[in-house]
Amino acid sequence: MTKRSRRIPAASLFLIGLRAAAGPQTEDEMAIAEVIEDDGEREPLPIRVRLASLRDYEEMCALFDDLDEIHRQARPDMFQPFPPPARTREQIAHWLAQPDSTVLVAQSEEGVVGLAVLMTRQPSGFAGAVPRKVVEVDNLVVRADQRGRRVGRRLLAAAVEWSRQRRATHVEVAVHDFNRDARRFYESFGFAASVDRLILAA
């Protein structure tokens, strides 16, 4: 009698196309995200979206802990606890130092309440692929007590702006099947499903 393989929920890849940007902007101009509106359920939180620095390290680790725990609870088959820190100082320093990656943080009066990690993906080596420059939103998380206050939307707007500054053609994000709220969030911003990645336990 053969063992029946169990279907595991999929992850979806979402993308949004970008128009070319008109030249680089300064860190202060990243605060453009402050004026972006969205459909948050609570009163918007006054924030400034800026480039992260290592001075934000402890607050960023707390946010990564929150994000990791969400995934551990929903997908224990894929994510497991590991010794702290949530991300090493060296790893974050590398993201900040490279021209093709960065971390954006949402700063409020009480500190850092959200972050987004952005990575530029190398073009495909496949001759049949249309040349694209893609920025991936590798992580985006808002502190639990500040969700629904338009922080995530303003972070995402700043992420798209950062991508435009670097002449990206698309911004992409992978969303696990369990995270329906995240899927609705990205779709409301204009992202559209591109690839459904299906997996099967062997």
Locations of regions flagged by a protein language model:
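Conserved active-site alpha-helix within GNAT-family acetyltransferase domains
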Residues: 153, 165, 177-195
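A conserved beta-turn-beta hairpin within the catalytic core of GNAT-like acetyltransferases
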Residues: 122-137, 147, 194
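Conserved GNAT-fold acetyl-CoA-binding loop/helix
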Residues: 69-91
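Conserved GNAT acetyl-CoA-binding A-motif
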Residues: 164-174
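A short helix-loop-beta-strand connector motif used in the catalytic cores of GNAT acetyltransferases and
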Residues: 90-104, 136
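Conserved N-terminal entry element of GNAT/NAT acetyltransferase domains
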Residues: 14-18, 22, 27-58
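Conserved beta-strand in the GNAT
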Residues: 105, 111-120, 136, 141
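Conserved acetyl-CoA-binding loop-helix of GNAT-fold acetyltransferases
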Residues: 148-161, 188
